[in-house]
Amino acid sequence: LTEVLGTQIEAGAKAERAVLISDLHVGTDGGAVLRSLDAALAVARDSADALFVLGDLFDSYVCRAQIRVGIWREVAARFRVATDGGLRIVVLVGNRDFLLGPEFVAATGAELVTGGYRVQLGGVDTLLVHGDELCQNDLPYQKAKRWLRHPLTRLVARSMPVALARRAAEKARKKSQNVIQSGDQSRFLPSERAVATAFAVGVERLIFGHIHRHARGSFERGSYHVLPAFDQDGVGLRIDPGGWQPVRFGKGAAAATEVELPEACAWSK
């Protein structure tokens, strides 16, 4: 394993053709994002080797018992149908669902990555991360992240009853929203130094989500793609040996339609 910005990076099996999505934020009521998810699963089953979810599949996930109830069970069932049909699904944890654990793997048949993932996608050496580790200037979040992911904190949280876990998640979300609305907004952007550190492991391409801003460009001798929040417009990324193309899933008659290439990302200093 390699560590980048406190994130353990796993090496994964290559995929010549892949679908990538991020930040679905599936809430307790499901919502329209499920239609886009179903379309992405269908496209991946028909034309890809793997589906990659780059974090925040769920709006919140705290305790292991959640996978047996409500929307968490519904999404798990969708994934199980796909994996039983032969689709490889790789799910990275995000800042909202970092407490996903073995119960998720058992229910879905997916691979769970608790850090980053280095993989050959379409023949290109690629690093996949959620993206929160790149936002190093968001000091309050980075400090909270360290104790939230401490083994003791994880043990207590994952053992909670579902009702208590949901109340705790709602309280934390409200507090987070208040923090986000105050102060210098540039601190929520990836820092140039952090992005350079990610590329320093030797990859040719970096793909991440988290900041909910669709972007794409070059960085030094590599290239990057920032996935937008999937729950906002159903946009993800298709990769094959011929290149990479952003697409919108589940809108209109077609399962996937191409969208315009986004502009470059802004970095914080």
What do these predicted regions represent?
Residues 17-18, 49-50, 124-126, 205, ...:
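Structural motif
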Residues 131-190:
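Active-site-proximal loop/helix segment associated with metal-binding centers of metalloenzymes
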Residues 107-114, 127, 132, 137-144, ...:
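Conserved beta-sheet core of the metallophosphoesterase superfamily
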Residues 118-121, 232, 254:
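A short acidic, often aromatic-flanked loop/helix-cap motif at beta-alpha or helix-coil junctions
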Residues 2-17, 21, 26-121:
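Core catalytic region of metal-dependent phosphoesterases/phosphodiesterases
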Residues 248-259:
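A short, surface-exposed interaction/processing loop segment used at functional sites
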Residues 59-82, 173-203:
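N-terminal short leaders/motifs
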Residues 258-269:
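A short, charged
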